[in-house]
Amino acid sequence: QCGGQAAFETALSALLAECEIDLIVLAGFLTILSADFTARWPSRILNVHPSLIPAFCGKGMYGLKVHEAALRAGVKVTGATVHFVNEIPDGGRILLQKAVDVLPDDTPETLQRRVMEQAEWLLLPRAAELVSEQIVKEKRNA
């Protein structure tokens, strides 16, 4: 509907600027943003990923796929990461991480739910708060 990724990102940038948005928070956003887009929003785009990056991350690692990979690998601990977004999938600077135990009877679904409840839902608001506080300080000092 937007005419491809470049047109989508152009329209999104215009809307974000028009609304004077200072922070973009992604959760379940399955589009890889371009280097041009992320460069316009340095240290202003947050993403939550359902693993302890650098484990089980990158292109194609999302949703249940992450938890399936963790269970296949036999890890005893997984978790979630909030990081800044750059042009590399899950490659931006890490802000916060929280570990979650993998239980012997876990399925991808039970693990996904526990990681969301015990890590993602706690980390993402806290990271947004930390970055927002920094943005406010920068604006006051400008």
Regions picked out by a protein language model, each given a short descriptive name:
Residues 1-142:
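One-carbon transfer enzymes
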